[in-house]
């Protein structure tokens, strides 16, 4: 059946009421109450992802055996192990294939989503692999150039900071596909910046100062909203 609006369970001899969410138990899922709708939503998304993975085992195994994955893992070494790459690739793929809004709220909707995803999982995983390979090549090329740029430490620090924000170790699952798809363009933009740097370092310094002023104001606002427990999609969208 559909998830109830509130869940009442008995814990340590007393009744506990909370917002229901599917909890990821590793090889299964369980329904548990949570104190806030936001917490329930976050936990439920992970639990639902696990339930999809359990119901699409053959497709998940096929992703783990995709040609080129071992070679990609060698490029990925600075971000994680081959096992971590596989886990993140599967999580990102299932997220894009299965965790589309509106999320399924009953067994029929879940079964329909599984059926729709079966034929897409391998193709979507290959798209993620192609993009990941492209990003890793661009990232490695930038790191090589930055390591030889001794005369502009402020620029190196600025670009390294941007690279760290764009490509954290879990970048495959940290960003939605519609954001990730633009990352190669951002990395190429950093390379173009380095191409122009020596000809006009003063212009780069001015642009960097203007950018930092804007970025710092954005970060202050983001932190203030986070402390207040407020999610602002418009603020996040402004980042891009």
Show the residue positions of the predicted features.
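A positional "C-terminalness" feature that preferentially activates on distal terminal regions of long
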Residues: 1-240
């Amino acid at each position: 059946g559909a998830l109830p609006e509130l869940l009442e369970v008995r814990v340590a001899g007393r009744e506990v009421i909370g917002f229901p969410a599917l909890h990821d138990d590793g090889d299964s899922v369980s329904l548990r109450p949570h104190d806030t709708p936001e917490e329930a939503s976050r936990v439920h998304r992970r639990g639902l992802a696990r339930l999809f993975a359990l119901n699409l085992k053959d497709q998940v195994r096929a992703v783990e055996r995709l040609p080129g994955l071992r070679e990609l893992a060698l490029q990925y070494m600075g971000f994680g192990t081959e096992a971590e790459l596989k886990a993140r690739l599967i999580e990102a793929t299932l997220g894009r294939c299965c965790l589309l809004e509106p999320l399924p709220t009953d067994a029929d909707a879940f079964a329909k989503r599984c059926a729709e995803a079966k034929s897409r999982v391998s193709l979507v995983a290959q798209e993620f692999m192609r993009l990941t390979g492209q990003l890793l090549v661009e990232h490695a090329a930038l790191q090589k150039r930055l390591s030889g740029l001794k005369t502009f430490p402020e620029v190196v620090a600025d670009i390294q900071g941007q690279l760290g924000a764009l490509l954290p170790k879990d970048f495959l699952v940290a960003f939605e596909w519609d954001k990730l798809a633009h990352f190669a363009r951002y990395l190429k933009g950093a390379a173009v910046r380095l191409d122009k740097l020596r000809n006009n370092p003063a212009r780069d310094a001015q642009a960097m100062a203007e950018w930092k002023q804007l970025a710092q104001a954005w970060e202050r606002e983001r932190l203030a909203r986070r402390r207040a427990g407020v999610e602002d999609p418009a603020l996040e969208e402004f980042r891009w």
